[in-house]
Amino acid sequence: MSKARVLLKPSSLTTCLTRAKAFFSSVSQSRSISHQMEMGPSDSERYCYDPVLRWNPEVEDYFTKAYGPDHFARISKALTRPSSYSCIRVNTVKTTSDAVIEKLTKILNDSEEGLKLVQPDGSSPVTKCQIPGLDYVVFVNGSGPHKIEYDSGLENPPKEVLVSRKCAEAVLRGAQVYVPGVLACTAHVEKGDAVAVCVAMEQPGDEGDWSVNMTRGTTLQGLPTDPYYRERSGLYIGMGTAMLSRAGMFRVPNGIAVDLNHRVFRLPSLHNILEGEIFLQNLPSIIVAHALDPQKGERILDMCAAPGGKTTAIAILMNDEGEIVAADRSHNKVLVVQNLSAEMGFTCITTCKLDALKSVCLPTTLNESTILINGDNSSSMTSHSELSSNEEMTSVTSRRSEADKSCEKNDSTEQPNGGDNVSQAYIRKNKGRLKNGRGRTQCQGGRAGKSQGFPPNSFDRVLLDAPCSALGLRPRLFAGLETVVSLRNHGWYQRKMLDQAVQLVRVGGILVYSTCTINPSENEAVVRYALDKYRFLSLAPQHPRIGGPGLVGRCEFPDGYIEEWLKPGEEELVQKFDPSSELDTIGFFIAKFSVGPKD
């Protein structure tokens, strides 16, 4: 009893209450901090567009060494955003730049989209390119990033539509949100509802693979308890109006799911506008045609021509006079080039189904003809020009330089070390093919006859716009699948195509090599290979020159592989387009070679 009476003394009770308040206050603060940690970022940080481009760690280390940490960080940031303008090439065979500018201005003025694109000073967003020689190029200026007001907050989170990464990348370039791109949606979304559009990004798996880890049709909750809540933070690309109910989005096969009327980046959608008169094309791709410098009456080969943008750009510079052979290994891709050529009204383009790795037909296997595909999809026989110097090219193809032997040595020593990585990359790629089904590039009808290739020295100029890792394309929201080994393999594959291209250019001709990647293994390293192996090749000046210099030096990898780049003095003879530069283009690389005597 005495102890109980002591506890009830006023002074002791006051002390206990004070301590209790302090204790519960600390508990409350702890819970608040814990709650904030569970909540993650604030609404302003969550409902915004601030993606971080994820790379394979070894690839990130390689690029950091090549470009420097600050420069590579700027490149990575720029890749997650679209260019601030759309670049249009005018088909001068049919129309003029002034006529196109007038038509585009009217089209944009008649649309709600156009009002949002008017420049701050009130000027039109449609302008003519001021680079000398490119007056047939038109820019349509966009804007962004814009701050979007989302109806956010825990008490009233916005209804959300989650789209695939590839859908989001198209939307950032001006497209609408179409049904096939929708992966998940908030419950009870009805037609006409305001919805926030966010992006589903690939997440790392337990076995080193990447996947979205979500079944199409998943219901989003919009609360911290949602298992996908954190993954969407900083990946909101705009607010729009649902054109279908939730049920409709997962029931119908196509159509617009969300009309995105408030975008982080505002770029006009120019799909199906002025067909035959204009072609939407990145500025560096137009520069490639100028680097080739085609002349009227010449015979040109575009080795990897699809979808035909560079082929038709070359035709414009030749004023549709001469012969352009547009080759591609896929039947359906060849048809795409045909259709574009017909749409733009060119007669100098002949399409040909041909694997770039089998482009050269040597005298021992030469057939008198090659099968080409005409515009009416029928096959005809077209004779090749005669082989000008069999002995000349025999010595070229048989001679093995020290650089070639070194490359083969590196190739043979690398494969065992990177075998597991190569297998994993192969498995991932084929998983995607199986999941996505037949692609549009897979032939769905009759097969076109295969070309037998061309004799050496058949062309005045050759363009090799090689298949590549495409790590310069933007916007790009994910880059984690490429490994150092896969990037190196891209370069070896391109060297094999270059070996073919070199043989097809006549003495005194021009060879242009280009890629849409920032990977030095596919750019500077391929140029080094070509110059060391073929002593009759030399880098030639390019006009216009608006890109930056290439990389000089070398890179030594942890596995002992040494990759040689450009030598001092060569860097200014190539053009490297940096996504983070003021030009605001995609990442791109162009090298132009003059072909000397092949002896």
UniProtKB/Swiss-Prot annotation:
InterPro entries named among the record's database cross-references: MeTrfase_RsmB-F_NOP2_cat, MeTrfase_RsmB-F_NOP2_dom, PUA, PUA-like_sf, PUA_sf, RCMT, RsmB/NOL1/NOP2-like_CS, SAM-dependent_MTases_sf
Key words of the record: Methyltransferase, Nucleus, Ribosome biogenesis, RNA-binding, rRNA processing, S-adenosyl-L-methionine, Transferase
Residues forming coiled coils: none
CC annotations in GO: nucleolus
EC assignment: 2.1.1.-
PROSITE patterns given in the database record: NOL1_NOP2_SUN (PS01153), PUA (PS50890), SAM_MT_RSMB_NOP (PS51686)
Biased segments, Basic and acidic residues type: 399-412
Binding-site list for S-adenosyl-L-methionine: 304-310, 328, 355, 465
GO molecular function terms attached to this record: RNA binding; RNA methyltransferase activity
Residues making up the signal peptide according to the UniProt record: none
Disruption phenotype: Normal levels of methylation at cytosine 2860 of 25S rRNA.
Residue numbers spanned by region Disordered: 372-454
Compartment list: Nucleus, Nucleolus
Domain PUA, chain residue ranges per copy: 158-265
Residue positions of the active site: 516
Catalytic activity: a cytidine in rRNA + S-adenosyl-L-methionine = a 5-methylcytidine in rRNA + S-adenosyl-L-homocysteine + H(+)
UniProt record, GO biological process: RNA methylation; rRNA processing
Compositional bias per record (Polar residues), positions renumbered to this chain: 413-424
One Pfam entry name: PUA
Annotated family: Belongs to the class I-like SAM-binding methyltransferase superfamily. RsmB/NOP family.
Main function: Involved in ribosomal large subunit assembly. S-adenosyl-L-methionine-dependent methyltransferase that may methylates the C(5) position of cytosine in rRNA. May play a role in the regulation of the cell cycle and the increased nucleolar activity that is associated with the cell proliferation. Seems involved in the regulation of cell proliferation.
Name the record gives this protein: rRNA (cytosine-C(5))-methyltransferase NOP2C
Species name: Arabidopsis thaliana (Mouse-ear cress)
Classification of source organism: Eukaryota, Viridiplantae, Streptophyta, Embryophyta, Tracheophyta
